[in-house]
């Protein structure tokens, strides 16, 4: 397995503990473009993983094969502050001009400090390409992303090796 390989992992988020997030640096949590061969279903718990040489996983994983036709962009940060998550300029550097959906996810432990459920909160959702995913102050639990709309996004960027991020559709 090469560090640049991207995996799509289907796991029950409530039963898996991603302890590796504790040791993931901010640089490895910035952004990743993920191309899937089929749309995500509303009931699919999904964890997107880009292998990083400093990150190790103790659970099994698999990834879809076939024609790549759908892309999703996810932004992630270790900060809990919506103002400190990421600058618009940095977002613009990673977001393709044709990007339709960008989801900002803050990856941090829950209030009790444990990792029994996937740590994260959606802080910004944008379906307007010209907005380039402007940061929003409102934070939503990751599980409330179920009704978020996804659009086809045919960016031409290669997969970016930047660590561990996740979402639930």
Swiss-Prot record:
<protein>
    <recommendedName>
        <fullName>Protein FAM106C</fullName>
    </recommendedName>
</protein>
<comment type="similarity">
    <text>Belongs to the FAM106 family.</text>
</comment>
